[in-house]
Regions:
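Helix-to-loop junction immediately C-terminal to a conserved catalytic motif
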Residues: 48
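Conserved ABC transporter NBD signature motif
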Residues: 56-67, 71-72
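ABC transporter nucleotide-binding domain
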Residues: 164-180, 184-243
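ABC-family P-loop ATPase nucleotide-binding domains
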Residues: 78-135
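The feature captures the beta-strand-to-loop junction immediately N-terminal to the Walker
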Residues: 33-35
Length: 276
């Protein structure tokens, strides 16, 4: 489990994260959402140990990530938004780096590359940005780590590749892995995540499972604008609306509408989820 308690971090005199408290459980995929500059990437780099918490604490199964202990580093993989090409074939690169992660399986890398319709013998410095991203995603999934942190993994992927990404994550990750994915491409995650975290500047606006969200909020696709809507957006033929779920009705989560509803009604949404 990843436990984050009262986490704070600043760049110079500019605070980015303040009093962030989260518990991320094994076996779940978390979508990390927020506007530009709210600290999503900073949070990922803190969790993987690239940065040190200035206040508060982070614990990954009892280990401080910044301690950089081998038993932690061998169980975490961080995929940044921008990845570097190397003058090597994908398969040679994977074979050379894989041993740093004890659960790495070259067969999984090759299988994931095949699922992405990628040639593993292709030189990485000759790949497009999307091809390079798919190679790194394949490697991340092949490492078999307890923690997988991804920053905008679908950036640069075409539409078929985004579907392949969702399938690959579900196919190749361990059942007990904690997966944290930061993205602005919310529709890319809609069918695969278990929980959603929405960060505001220096605050957590929402941290809830999909089941809890749809039990407390109703996503209405209709032609009549509702008076109790927390957020409404006109679509061809009607509206997508987010309303308090006072009747226990089932509805299909719309992450983009949820994000806007939370940002437009921060205190009200907090009250709904805190049963106030």
């Amino acid at each position: 489990m990843i436990k984050i308690e009262n986490l704070g971090f600043s760049y110079g005199k500019t605070p980015v994260l303040k009093n962030i408290t989260l518990n991320l459980e094994p076996g779940k995929i978390y979508g990390l959402l927020g506007e530009n500059g709210v600290g999503k990437t900073t949070l990922l780099t803190l969790v993987c140990g690239l940065k040190k918490a200035q206040t508060g604490s982070i614990s990954c199964d009892g280990i401080d990530p910044y301690s950089r202990k081998p038993e932690f580093l061998s169980q975490v993989f961080y995929l940044p938004d921008e990845v570097a090409p190397v003058p090597s074939t994908a398969i040679a690169w994977a074979k050379s780096l894989g041993p740093f992660w004890p659960n790495f399986k070259i067969e999984t890398f090759s299988s994931a590359m095949k699922d992405f319709e990628m040639d593993e013998t292709m030189k990485m410095h000759k790949m497009s940005a999307g091809q390079l991203k798919k190679t790194y995603i394949s490697f991340a999934l092949a490492c078999g780590t307890s923690y997988i942190l991804m920053d905008e993994p679908t950036n640069g992927l075409d539409i078929p590749s985004k579907a392949q990404f969702r399938s690959a994550v579900l196919k190749y990750t361990r059942d007990d892995s904690t997966i944290l994915i930061s993205t602005h491409q919310v529709k890319d995650l809609e069918s695969m995540i278990d929980s959603i975290i929405i960060l505001d500047r220096k605050d957590v606006l929402l941290n809830a499972s999909v089941e809890e969200i749809t039990s407390k909020l109703f996503f209405d696709y209709g032609s009549i604008l509702r008076q109790d809507a927390l957020y409404a957006e006109q679509l061809p033929g009607g509206f997508i609306q987010v309303c308090p779920n006072t009747t226990g009705e089932d509805s299909k989560l719309n992450i983009e509408a949820l994000f806007n509803a939370v940002h437009n009604n921060k205190e009200l949404v907090k009250a709904i989820f805190n049963n106030e």
